[in-house]
From Swiss-Prot:
A Pfam family hit: Solute_trans_a
Alphabetic keyword roster: Membrane, Transmembrane, Transmembrane helix
Membrane topology listed for this record: Multi-pass membrane protein
MF terms in GO: transmembrane transporter activity
Primary localization class, coarse: membrane
Membrane-spanning residues: 17-37, 48-68, 86-106, 176-196, 212-232, 254-274, 287-307
Organism, scientific name: Bos taurus (Bovine)
Name of this protein: Transmembrane protein 184C
Example of a GO cellular component annotation carried by this entry: membrane
Annotated region described as Disordered, given as residue ranges: 358-438
Bias (Basic and acidic residues): 426-438
Protein task: Possible tumor suppressor which may play a role in cell growth.
Length: 438
């Protein structure tokens, strides 16, 4: 019985336990680092590794504390699960870079985890946005269809715009999902090329594999970010309660800065700014470039951890009536069934999505009947009435700015269903706004 009560009150002791474990890790890690500095002649490499370790010890507790708070207040799984996955990016990046800085010979293999998780983060951010929207607006496709046509941004402004509705929604999701496939695939190719000694990381030359993989990864990443930006532009008003701009910048800056600074460092090697004259304890100039990249990432992740603490805060999810066990919250963090389901859905619809053929368009694109016309066809009214009868999801309520945002249906949907009900009862209401277009 006492054991059961202890586990039920896990929210009270889990945070002090985490603090104690972190302090113990510092007690063990700091003497080992000092001993490492004393046993060898201190050089630039060792100093850089020690400084990066200091930033690592500052970064890890900030990120893990926010993750732990989300687990303690795990009240909205569909929103907090992708947030927790995004928050893990900072500890993974920081620890990976610190290990790679210490052991340059295995950097290519350790960095594989970082590069794969980068794509995973972008996918989960898209999942966070779509989960919020579909829970608050069960008829999300109808909302997008009712909006004005969104044109492409430069440099794709000459391309035909994506049809508003299901086509745009699935193409944006597919554009993000493709990066989660391309990035791990190119990472595996990089490992194979490294084993075959044809990778030559950091050397811009069309005779090696690294240059081609950088181009492929860059194009795939840019398109994924473009789809995210287009998705936000279309649904900017609906996403405003969760303040997505700060979250988008946190994800975008970490991913883009880490990628492009690697390209800039490689260019510095190419033009001779980083040369063989100053390799310090590193064996090659390419190893110097990789070490510099890892050192900078360790510093940047400290800043990213602070930014994540505020932009992905746990406070909107704190509720008085909290249920669930410690193990349920912890295991839910590693559950990837939602990713499997999403990939299956995209595979089933990929043909129709690419070709631009939605299953059904509730708002027909006609010159006499468009989104500015106040009369809907009978078939559109029927579709809207059916859609409005679907109960909203009970999860996904985001408590921000002192109130709880509850699931809603579109105003058009609600009005259409009300009009249908009034007609059936034989009651006609006078129009309260503009006269009906003939």
């Amino acid at each position: 019985m006492p054991c059961t009560c202890t586990w039920r009150n896990w929210r009270q002791w889990i945070r002090p336990l985490a603090v104690v474990l972190y302090l113990l890790s510092i007690v063990v890690a700091v003497p080992l680092c000092v001993w490492e500095l004393q046993k060898l002649e201190v050089g630039i490499h060792t100093k850089a590794w020690f400084i990066a370790g200091i930033f690592l010890l500052l970064t890890i507790p900030i990120s893990l504390w926010v993750i732990l708070q989300h687990l303690v207040h795990y009240t909205q799984p569909e929103l907090q699960k992708p947030i927790i996955r995004i928050l893990w990016m900072v500890p993974i990046y920081s620890l990976d870079s610190w290990i790679a800085l210490k052991y340059p010979s295995i950097a290519i293999y350790v960095d594989t985890c970082r590069e794969c998780y980068e794509a995973y983060v972008i996918y989960n951010f898209m999942g966070f946005l779509t989960n919020y929207l579909t829970n608050r607006y069960p008829n999300l496709v109808l909302i997008i269809e009712a909006k004005d046509q969104q044109k492409h941004f430069p440099p794709l402004c000459c391309c035909p715009p994506w049809t508003m509705g299901e086509v745009l929604l699935f193409r944006c999701k597919l554009g993000v999902l493709q990066y989660t496939v391309v990035r791990p695939f190119t990472t595996i190719i990089a490992l194979v090329c490294e084993l075959l000694d044809i990778y030559d990381e950091g050397n811009f030359s069309f005779s090696n594999a690294w240059t081609y993989l950088v181009i492929i990864n860059n194009m795939s990443q840019l398109f994924a970010m473009y789809c995210l930006l287009l998705f936000y532009k279309v649904l900017k008003e609906e996403l405003s309660p969760i303040q997505p701009v700060g979250k988008f910048l946190c994800v975008k800056l970490v991913v883009f800065v880490s990628f492009w600074q690697a390209v800039v460092i490689a260019l510095l090697v190419k033009v001779g700014v980083i040369s063989e004259k100053h390799t310090w304890e590193w064996q090659t100039v390419e190893a110097v470039a990789t070490g510099l990249q890892d050192f900078i990432i360790c510093i940047e992740m400290f800043l990213a951890a602070i930014a994540h603490h505020y932009t992905f805060s746990y406070k909107p999810y704190v509720q008085e009536a909290e249920e669930g066990s410690c193990f349920d919250s912890f295991l839910a963090m590693w559950d990837v069934s939602d990713i499997r389901d999403d990939i299956s859905e995209q595979v089933r619809h990929v043909g129709r999505t690419v070709m631009g053929h939605p299953r059904k368009k509730f708002f027909p694109e006609d010159q006499d009947q468009n989104e500015h016309t106040s009369l809907l066809s009978s078939s559109s009214q029927d579709a809207l009435s059916v859609a409005s009868s679907v109960p909203p999801s009970p999860v996904g309520h985001y408590q921000g700015f002192g109130h709880t945002v509850t699931p809603q249906t579109t105003p058009t949907t609600a009005n259409a269903s009300d009009d249908t009900g009034n007609d059936a009862a034989g009651v006609r209401e006078e129009p309260s706004e503009k006269p009906v277009a003939s």
